[in-house]
Amino acid sequence: MESSNQPNVLIFDSGVGGLSVFQEINKRLPEVNYYYLFDNQAYPYGELSQETLLARVEALVVKMTQQFAIDLVVIACNTASTIVLPALRAKLPIPVVGVVPAIKPASLLANRAVGLIATPATVTRQYTHDLIRDFAHEKEVELLGSTRLVDIAEEKLRGRQVDQQELAMILKPMKHKVDVAVLGCTHFPLLKEEIQQVLGDEIILVDSGEAIARRVQSLLHQLSPQSTKTPWRIFSTAQPWDEAALNGSLKTMGFNAIELYPL
């Protein structure tokens, strides 16, 4: 087992979208030793059965938690969070933080209508409709499910130019209909500037990143920051496409080159 004097935080996702969550946590807790694991072998998670998804996430997270003496786990994926949290919390003796679409804060900000931009799996899941019923029942809610937006975010992190015309076509059903839009997938804050440009500055964009960062900070409030900081480690379950370009972006965030971590 490897250990260090720094608190070890594992951030888990099916792709690189969870890096938007990492960035928010890192703003508050730059002294933490970060491990990022993405299960790109099974990407996208929205196409997996619940049983397969649960088995994969549980196996990977438990293994890495034990190997690297992890102190806290963040499941930085909306799809996985709706399925795996109870099982992981029962198995692990450490805090496990999940993400949910920020429908409640969006509803409080909205005057007339809330938009939820998410993956098709999140848009159709009962859990999401329960959130809408509980926290946004007095508002009109527009739902937009897009897998292509996830791919665009993955491409952007590899240095590809975002096609604003394509983005405008995808987001067209949301334009002029809502005053607050929820970025309901952790990939989407990576496209926040481009989405804002398409929807217009009058639309407020809300995501879960800051709330997750506050939660992690409160759970790790007894940290003792160290003056020296080592490069953080990032793992994938299969070789990523355009790995060299992706490693370039990851280096600017403080990560070492991607290491293979098969299931």
Curated annotation (Swiss-Prot):
The active site is at C77 (proton donor/acceptor), C185 (proton donor/acceptor). Keywords: Cell shape, Cell wall biogenesis/degradation, Isomerase, Peptidoglycan synthesis. Its EC number is 5.1.1.3. GO terms for biological process: cell wall organization; peptidoglycan biosynthetic process; regulation of cell shape. Pathway: Cell wall biogenesis; peptidoglycan biosynthesis. The keyword Isomerase applies. GO terms for molecular function: glutamate racemase activity. Substrate binds at D13, S14, Y45, G46, N78, T79, T186, H187. Gene3D superfamilies: 3.40.50.1860. It catalyses: L-glutamate = D-glutamate. It comes from the Bacteria. The keyword Cell wall biogenesis/degradation applies. It is an enzyme of class 5 (isomerase). HAMAP family: Glu_racemase. NCBIfam families: glut_race. Belongs to the aspartate/glutamate racemases family. Provides the (R)-glutamate required for cell wall biosynthesis. PANTHER family: GLUTAMATE RACEMASE. This is Glutamate racemase. It comes from Vibrio vulnificus (strain YJ016). The lineage of its organism: Bacteria, Pseudomonadati, Pseudomonadota, Gammaproteobacteria, Vibrionales. The gene is murI.
